[in-house]
Swiss-Prot record:
Gene, per the UniProt record: KIF28P
Membrane topology classification: Peripheral membrane protein
Main location: mitochondrion
Sequence positions that bind ATP: 111-118
Protein name: Kinesin-like protein KIF28P
């Protein structure tokens, strides 16, 4: 028998990187310094380190190899790698020992989806997990017992989703779920739950497989998602000692907890929380029960144990509150992109001390049916078939649909509902498969959605071995052809992510489209890869949400958008991408923009409402309870960049710039004017142009921003009843300045001017003007929305009523060429280099002006003969410049009077042309390739021509400046 168990064991296990985490370039943020200590490091703040202490800490991230049987073992005996056998030895044997001694034993598994719970508890293939090993060892020990003992093993398996219980060993689904009853002797029990007697491990294995199939069917048809439901497997183990008239009864509870939803990260905060709160309710109440029981064990006075507060705690009352020995396995991901979820899991495990795992069982009746079905299925192994795929690896390839000779309907995981939904609900009328003449074809019916290898089909299509099929929104299957076509292919590579990547590629979504060129080497950066992973993860969810909107006639259409945060950055850098969901109402044309987290939360609420609709509840839904409804809001349509470099030289800038939306397409054209002025508002002329921005240092600087009009607003073309507003914020201004709203105009005339003043222009402010752009946002107004406030209350103003900027010291802006040398394109660096090349010209001009003053003084004193003779040479910043002879001085003085004015004009022309070049560069960087492959070659030619034009414009601007200065 195993060594004696302890009453409570808490453990944590770290898995290897998943393929998705590898693709995202994830880094490991978890370390283990001993078998009991786990340390996490915040990826955003490496100095922020948290340490957690557990009874056991298993390092399974790396340092392993495969033995001859394919089992993972430590590559080096001195290393700390923990395999499946190590976990069972520490936890599984303790569970068995408790059962033999008559104690209730509970094993709890907790962790975010994909953290490795299923691998630790059930395992795959030869890498057997805790549950099957416990069952196998239990029957092995029974076989070695004496003849004076009788043993009885009973299995039951249920699922708890939103406080509703479902028996996974029953093919029939009871409306409203099973009920919990209470008996004075038995305590809480589930009325009508099937408990199946088992005589050997093979029966348990078949029951687990059967239960998993039933659960797979449920998740395939969008009922309780496996990651958001609790799974409870109970093994009732009874020992009867005939010679001693003694009976021992123990209950082994194997519980797989749903993942806990952190409201803030999931977007539930301030939104509807019912679905998420139902999931969290069981976890919270379980933690409360455990905490109270722990207080009681320490001798504290306990008035009430809240078993009745949730379904889960009612069922586990006898296991938690009696002679139970409980073990917890917290499964976590080591990736930095999962840091928040990992930290949440570790905190829960350390605080509550207990959590659970999953298992499976089946009924005696179902087992007989399975045997009969197996005898019928054996000869069918020669037919081609479909294998199901699921996001949960444990539910993948557990359903097999054989395609026999002739024509048969598409796989229907549950009884067909009437009327069948053309995409969401898969019925036998969705599509048909025909097996004839040694080939298999699939034919979609009516408007039903069918995709083969990611490409939608509308007519009869021949299937090839290992083709990928998607029926409806997200029912995925792998086609396995005739046995003659089988080879040594590795089917494991065709996982759920493979299907979604293929689907995304077929729909034109790729890392390149999302902006992969932001890495200087042409490779997608981590932010792009992370956004792409979010994009493909949300694609099937958006498709399902659209279908759920159709049948109840909600009239919504949802589509994915990718927001480039560079559109909100005044330097125009390619920053992090963000995936959003644009929601449009067909009838009213109202538009909403939902974040990823908000959409996911709403989608689960939509699923609940849709299930009620399927159950026959077609009554009206209050707005506050309708996840398809939201208050009308203002929508951000696009942004424009207006570079402020000319303002640093006191030059007026008037131009038309494009508002670009999140797709990089033109949303409207903005006509604006930015001009330096006097405190009284009089615009400066050419004579006020400065050669060097440093001349403005410490001086008062006033300027006006005049928003003239917008042209061709697409938002207004879609619905003439809409309106627009424009907002911008400059430098350290705490609030955004908004123009007055304009309704029902495609070309809104705005004509609003705001004057700003920097009382003592700082070096930081001047650097900002030289290197940054003014971000102007275009906002769309809808009927019933709240307009953006135009009030300027709270802003600091001068005595003349002008808004103050540059009011506080900030950190000196780093040189752009150093701060973003690895982020900005080569052409942008060339523009910066061009600015640096003008510095020697400015130095020469400054020195000539100083010498001009000396020459004027000399000429004034020439008549008296007292003038000092000027030097024939002048040193300028390490260079030697030859000065004019005495005979040329008089002529030079007459020409010098207009030189400053000519230089100012030349610089004005130069910076205006460079501003055009900078705008063209920004549009070039936002230029996206077409989705159609046939247009790729014209796109490459067009982009090459744009680069050539930009280079010519840069060279022309520089040549004009140099020639003007030399004349």
């Amino acid at each position: 028998m195993p060594t004696q168990s302890v009453d409570s064991v808490k453990a944590v296990r770290v898995r290897p990187f998943s393929q998705r985490e590898k693709n995202s370039g994830s880094k490991c943020v978890i370390s283990m310094h001993s078998r009991t200590t786990t340390t996490t490091q915040d990826p955003k703040n490496p100095e922020h380190v948290k340490t957690f202490t557990f009874d056991l800490a298993y390092w399974s991230h790396n340092g392993f190899q495969r033995d001859k049987d394919g089992v993972l073992i430590s590559a080096d005996p001195s290393r700390k790698f923990a395999g499946q056998r190590d976990v069972f030895h520490d936890l599984g044997r303790g569970i068995l020992d408790s059962a033999w001694q008559g104690y209730n034993a509970t094993l709890l598994a907790y962790g975010q989806t994909g953290s490795g719970k299923s691998y630790s508890m059930i395992g795959f293939g030869c890498k057997q997990g805790i549950i099957p090993t416990v069952c196998e060892e239990l029957f092995r020990a029974i076989e070695n017992q004496g003849r004076n003992q009788e043993h009885q093993v009973m299995f039951s398996m249920l699922e708890i989703y939103k406080e509703i219980i479902r028996d996974l060993l029953s093919r029939t689904k009871k409306p409203g779920g099973l009920r919990i009853r209470e008996d004075q002797q038995l305590g809480f029990y589930v009325e009508g739950l099937k408990s199946v007697p088992c005589e050997n491990y093979a029966q348990i294995e078949r029951l687990m497989e059967q239960g998993t199939k039933i659960r797979t069917t449920a998740s395939t048809n969008m009922n309780a998602s496996s990651s958001r439901s609790h799974l409870v497997i109970t093994i009732q183990f009874k020992q009867v000692f005939l010679d001693r008239d003694l009976t021992k009864q123990s209950s082994i509870n194997l519980v797989d907890l749903a993942r806990s939803e952190r409201q803030k990260s999931s977007g539930s905060e301030g939104d509807r929380l019912r679905e998420g709160s139902c999931v969290n309710l069981s976890l919270t109440n379980l933690g409360s029960v455990i905490s109270v029981l722990a207080d009681a064990a320490m001798g504290k006075k306990v008035l009430h144990i809240p078993y009745r507060d949730s379904v889960l705690t009612k069922l586990l009352q006898s296991a938690l509150g009696g002679n139970s020995r409980t073990a917890l396995v917290a499964a976590v991901s080591p990736a930095d992109i999962c840091y928040e979820e990992t930290l949440s899991t570790l905190r829960y495990a350390e605080r509550e001390r207990k959590i659970r795992n999953r298992a499976v069982a089946n009924t005696w009746t179902l087992m007989r049916k399975s045997r009969a079905e197996n005898s019928k299925l054996l000869p069918m192994m020669t037919f081609p078939h479909l294998l199901n795929l699921s996001e949960d690896p444990q539910l993948t390839r557990v359903l097999k649909y054989f395609i026999q000779a002739g024509t048969q309907p598409a796989p229907c995981p549950r009884p067909a509902l009437s009327p069948p939904h053309p995409a969401l609900r898969i019925s036998d009328k969705h599509a048909s498969f025909t097996n004839a003449d040694g080939k298999v074809t699939v034919t979609p019916h009516s408007k039903c959605k069918v995709a083969v290898n990611g490409v939608p089909i509308t007519t009869r299509t021949k299937l090839q071995h290992l083709d990928r099929l998607i029926l409806g929104s997200n029912s995925t299957y792998l086609y396995v052809g005739f046995p003659s076509e089988w080879g040594s292919e590795d089917l494991s590579r065709f996982d759920y992510d493979f299907f979604q990547l293929e689907r995304a590629a077929a729909e034109g979504a790729s890392a390149d489209k999302l902006g992969a060129a932001d890495g200087g080497d042409g490779k997608a950066g981590p932010s792009v890869l992370a956004a792409f992973q979010d994009y493909i993860k949300l694609m099937p969810l958006v498709s399902e949400a659209n279908q759920m909107s159709e049948e109840p006639k909600k009239g919504l259409n949802m589509e994915l958008k990718v927001k480039n945060l560079a559109s909100s950055d005044s330097r125009g850098y390619d920053l992090q991408k963000e995936v959003l969901v644009k929601v449009t109402h067909h009838g009213s044309h109202e538009v909403w923009i939902w974040s990823k987290a908000k959409f996911i939360n709403r989608k689960f609420l939509m699923q609940e409402l849709y299930q009620r609709f399927l159950d026959g509840d077609h009554g009206p839904v209050a707005r506050d309870d309708d996840p398809f409804w939201d208050p009308v809001e203002v929508v951000r349509l696009g942004s424009a960049h207006i570079w402020l470099q000319s303002l640093a030289y006191c030059m007026k800038l008037e131009e038309q710039v494009e508002f670009l939306n999140c797709d990089g397409l033109e949303e409207a054209v903005l006509h604006t004017c930015i001009a330096p002025c006097s405190p009284t508002g009089q615009t400066h002329g050419e004579e006020d142009v400065v050669i060097d921005p440093l001349e403005l240092l410490g001086k008062r600087m006033d300027f006006q921003i005049h928003i003239v009009r917008c042209l061709g607003v697409n938002w207004m073309k879609e619905d003439a009843k809409r309106g627009t507003q424009i907002g911008y914020r400059i430098y350290d201004l705490p609030n955004t300045i908004y123009t007055k709203p304009v309704w029902k105009s495609v070309n809104p005339q705005i004509e609003e001017t705001v004057q700003f003043a920097a009382l003592t222009a700082s070096q930081e402010f001047l650097n900002y003007l030289r290197t940054n752009a003014l971000i102007v946002d275009l906002w769309g107004l809808q009927e019933g929305c709240t307009e953006l406030s135009c009030s300027q209350l709270g802003l600091m103003v001068t005595g003349e009523g002008h808004i103050l900027v540059d009011t506080k010291k900030i950190s000196t802006v780093k040189d752009i060429s150093q701060a973003a040398s690895n982020q900005i394109p080569e052409l942008y660096l060339k523009l910066l280099k061009l600015e640096q090349e003008t510095e020697p010209l400015r130095n020469i001009n400054r020195a000539l002006r100083e010498e001009n003053v000396l020459l004027k003084a000399s000429l004034a004193k020439t008549a008296s003969g007292q003038a000092p003779k000027p030097s024939n040479t002048l040193k300028i910043s390490g260079m030697t410049a030859q000065l004019p002879s005495a005979g040329e001085m008089s002529q030079m003085c007459t020409q010098q009077a207009g030189s400053d004015r000519e230089l100012a004009k030349a610089l004005k022309v130069f910076y205006q042309s460079m501003n055009t070049a900078r705008g063209q560069l920004f549009r070039l960087r936002r230029h996206q390739p077409p989705e159609v492959d046939q247009m790729l070659r014209p796109f490459i030619h067009q982009r090459s021509q744009m680069f050539k034009d930009l280079g010519d414009l840069r060279e022309s601007s520089l040549w004009t400046l140099k020639m003007t200065l030399l004349l």
